Amino acid sequence: MVEVGVSDIAIYVPPFYLSHEELAKARGVPKEKYIMGLGNQKMAVIPNWEDAVTMAANAAMQVLEKTRTDPEDIQQLVVSTESGVDHSKAVASFVQGLLKIGTRCRVYEVKHACYGGTAGLVDSIDRISRNGKTSRKGLVIMTDIAKYGFGNAGESTQGAGAVALLVEKNPRLCSIDTSLNGVFSKDVFDFWRPTGHRVPIVDGKFSIECYLMALEGSVSEFRSNLGLEQGKLLDHMDYIIYHMPFTNMARKAHRRLIEIECEGKDLETQEEIYNQTFSDKVAPGLMGVREVGNIYTGSVYMGLISLLENEREKAEGKRIGIFSYGSGCGAEFLLYNMQTDISGIINSLHFKEQLDKRKEITFEQYTQFYSKSSEEVFYYPDEANSFKNRYTKFVFTGFKDHKRQYI
């Protein structure tokens, strides 16, 4: 049986960030509320010349360039987002044009809150696996701007970014057997954004309850599909990456997993197992959410990139459990089987380099970015070109005849 999975991955984050220390000072709260309470340190801030389209294209261009992939070989282009720019025209269509992907390609957008990226990935893997041509590839992109009300309780968990994955047969990074996936879904209102609302409505406590309920449900099916007894799952995975709207959500999730897998053990033993497995299996994937914040659909895959950059060759040949959750709600637990030689892919990630090259902004500058929507700004081509750099290949310049313009 031919393996199908991910051959390469790339991330794009905006060039600005606001520190949580600066945000706490402006909001008149102790910095520990954000840094210790959430576990975060910074949040990405997107400028007016970027949006979900530019971030998606900028992440995807990295993948195409470093793998030397012919855009004509892309058979399926999926963009998952809850930050769409048009009620009808898909973000994926804009990206298709910017990347010059051919017409013999299935192009569409997926929406299911933060779970949408995994839904698009699983669908692409299944489609590529059914296609007889080994040259056919899928390009799956997650792109989002997590934006809450100015001064809202969720403001400190904001962020922005995009992740792109290249899907094909005989993958170079990891294989994924989707028949093993554990899924869970239920109709709930834990996080939603009604039509016409610029920011979401969040029932924070209930959303965490839904997340943990979905984790338990998807893990149960995943374990059953693997044929494992309860209590054996932790030994089957070298690392675990949870969906992380904020850093400490990974702690809540892992504690629940330990309670499930260590049922019957005394609390002291459970705590020992939690501390050891969190340090070894979960902590290596936390860098991105600490530095960037929540990027919705791409959050769990930013965790994968963080793990790869931190663990490097130690991740070769390992098994990584992935828990993807989206409000509303839908969830899936997957297993990534890493290939044994991925050093070249890891060396081409440059995530830490992107983070280091960002510019810190003041709270006043953050206020200006927040108050000006992209619909109110237009940049002439010469001015817009000045915003480009090694990672920012595409920028938004405004509207012409109600059509979004990019260069």
Segments (PLM) and residue ranges:
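Short, well-ordered amphipathic alpha-helical segments that serve as non-catalytic structural scaffolds
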Residues: 30, 53-67, 91, 210-227, ...
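Flexible, glycine-rich active-site loops centered on histidine and acidic residues
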Residues: 129-164
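Conserved beta-ketoacyl condensing-enzyme motif
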Residues: 6, 52-118, 229-257
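Condensing-enzyme catalytic core mediating Claisen C-C bond formation in acyl metabolism
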Residues: 1-49, 152-220, 332-407
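Acidic, glycine-rich active-site loops and adjacent beta-strand->loop/helix elements
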Residues: 10-12, 80-86, 112-117, 142-147, ...
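A conserved active-site cap/scaffold subdomain adjacent to cofactor or substrate pockets
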Residues: 205-226, 231-259, 288, 293
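C-terminal catalytic subdomain
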Residues: 264-265, 279-356
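Conserved catalytic cysteine-centered active-site region
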Residues: 33-37, 41-53, 84-137, 143, ...
